[in-house]
């Protein structure tokens, strides 16, 4: 961001005008601008609703892909620089083995080969009382991790409480957290999505900020 006008500045509540990297002029206050979650509202409003395809990756763009992964419902989001350009829910059916094979092919042949991400971020496993579910999710993380390593793509496995703290969607239980995620995405982008997609979008937002906050991507691969 570039500061354009702070002539009336007296304190954190004073009005200022800044310009984002896309040239949008934003009137805000220093207090709002200093928040970790501050983003250009005009960029966020320029969102394609229910996009059917992932747009071609622009020259010089940093593409981030984020997952809220499970073997049946797989939320996914794509950001070019800090702009949300695609989001979708992939559904997999059949036996566990067939679902894992389908997910492997989707991540390898579509996400990695066609979309050409620079960075992939996905959620770490939450504690599960059901040991079978825990093992399945661990296997899924292992598959995605190996695909990232094989393609030499930088990645991050983020703990749920970390990205939720950034998104301000932590709740007393999982149901509340899902509702908060859907509401947060509606607030930010004015789109209606499922909780799986909402969480994939918020994980992507976290990853975009994570990349912007570090000069060297030393974590992950």
Residue locations for each model-derived region?
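Phosphate- and other anionic-substrate recognition elements at nucleic-acid/protein interfaces
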Residues: 52-221
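Functional cation/ligand-contacting sites centered on basic and imidazole/sulfhydryl donors
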Residues: 1-55
């Amino acid at each position: 961001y570039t500061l354009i006008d702070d002539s009336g500045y007296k304190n954190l509540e004073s009005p200022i005008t800044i310009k984002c990297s896309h040239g949008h002029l934003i009137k805000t206050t220093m207090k709002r601008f200093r928040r970790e979650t501050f983003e250009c509202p005009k960029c966020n409003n320029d969102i394609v609703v229910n996009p059917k395809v992932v747009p071609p990756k622009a020259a010089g763009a940093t593409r981030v892909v984020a997952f809220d992964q499970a073997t049946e419902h797989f939320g996914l989001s794509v950001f070019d620089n800090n702009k949300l350009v695609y989001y979708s829910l992939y559904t997999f059916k059949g036996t566990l083995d067939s679902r894992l094979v389908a997910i492997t092919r989707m991540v390898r042949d579509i996400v990695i080969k066609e979309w050409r991400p620079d960075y992939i971020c996905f959620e770490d496993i939450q504690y599960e009382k059901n040991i079978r579910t825990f093992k399945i999710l661990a296997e899924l993380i292992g598959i995605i991790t190996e695909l990232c390593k094989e393609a030499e793509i930088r990645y991050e496995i983020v703990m749920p409480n970390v990205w939720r703290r950034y998104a301000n969607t932590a709740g007393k239980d999982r149901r509340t957290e899902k509702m908060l995620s859907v509401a947060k995405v509606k607030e930010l982008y004015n789109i209606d999505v499922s909780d799986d997609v909402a969480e994939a979008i918020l994980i992507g937002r976290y990853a975009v900020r994570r990349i912007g906050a570090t000069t060297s991507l030393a974590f992950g691969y």
